[in-house]
Regions:
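One-carbon transfer enzymes
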Residues: 1-324
């Protein structure tokens, strides 16, 4: 499949470059860079001082100088050694949205792309959304049903939510109501915002390649199911919230290291006597409690990563057995 990339130049974040690399090594062709040529607004130093959001100063300092996730490390697309034509585009601003002009859209359409990855520009609408066969694909690294807005991976820790989520969606003209191509949940790393964000970004790099494989295999039903989230839109935390957040993370880190030093994990294997499809697609029936394997010495043994199979009508289990 042929794809293009909406970007702000040759510099990408590490996880974005890894996404492109996986697509290319997976047999797909990067045929176009659509580069944001809009000039940055020029603001003089006096106006910056007057209009600076001092109520969010702690967040801005922390995010700029303390947040160093490996997944956001700047990386040059030239490192992939690809020859990619590019189009530099000036968009038309209407409210908070950006629209491409007809001349640029004509050039983009001429490349007959299968899809476009959005790694740049702002809120895009209009003809660009239909400039590729399967549209424009964009990431949202938060649970769209709970946390819309910014910052990524922050509010799950703030609200002690045990899981994060991320989605890859095909954009539509209605904000946050795209077509979900991929969605997954990840355990929240509540003792480190940096580690939590890093995990979210690096765990989703293969998604566009997976969607391409589905399309090539004729699995396309998900391409027309629209999403309609109704969650609140979150904003950057003010100084009070950020202070409380940092204290919470510090407490979580102390608790994490205490457990790591003085406590041990207990793993076991449970058997539920129902077909697996009932777990994948639960209905109105009641799922019974697992039948746990008996462990003779619970203090120094655990079982994990099981695989079950039947021999003469009896279930046998292959698993990891650890005695410590």
């Amino acid at each position: 499949m042929k794809f293009g990339i909406l970007c702000n130049g040759n510099i990408f974040q590490q996880w974005q470059l890894e996404t492109i690399r996986q697509l290319v090594t997976g047999g797909h062709s990067c045929d176009l860079l659509i580069v944001n040529a809009n000039p940055l607004p020029q603001i003089n130093f006096r106006d910056k001082l007057i209009n600076y959001p001092y109520s969010k100063l702690i967040y801005r300092i922390w995010f700029r100088f303390m947040m160093r996730p490996e997944a956001k490390r700047p990386s040059n697309i030239c490192d992939l050694h690809l020859v990619i034509p590019e189009i530099r585009c000036y968009t038309i601003k209407k409210g908070y949205s950006e629209y491409f002009n007809e001349a640029d859209l004509k050039q983009i359409n001429a490349h007959k792309l299968d899809f476009i990855l959005r790694f740049g520009f702002g809120i895009i609408k209009g003809g660009i959304l239909n400039a590729a066969k399967y549209g424009v694909w964009s990431y949202h690294h938060d649970d769209d049903r709970k946390y819309r807005g910014v910052p990524t991976g922050f509010w799950e820790i703030w609200y002690s939510d045990p899981v994060n989520a991320a989605i890859l969606q095909r954009l539509t003209d209605k904000l946050d109501s795209g077509v979900i191509l991929r969605k997954a949940y990840f355990k929240t790393i509540n003792h480190s915002w940096q580690a939590n964000l890093n995990n979210l970004l690096q765990s989703t790099t293969e998604w566009p390649l997976q969607v391409c494989r589905d399309i090539e295999n004729g699995i396309t039903g998900f391409l027309s199911v629209r999403n309609s989230p109704e969650s609140a839109i979150f904003r950057l935390p003010d100084n009070l919230k950020m202070t409380r957040f940092l204290l919470k993370v510090a407490f979580n880190k102390l608790r994490f290291h205490f457990r790591d030093l003085f406590l041990t994990e207990k793993w076991n294997i449970g058997i539920i006597p129902i077909p697996i499809e009932k777990l994948i697609n639960p209905g109105s029936y009641e799922i019974p409690e697992p039948q746990w394997l008996k462990i003779n010495n619970k203090r120094s043994v655990y079982y994990a990563d099981p695989f079950g199979y039947f021999v003469a009508g009896k279930i046998n289990i292959v698993c990891i057995f650890l005695l410590y």
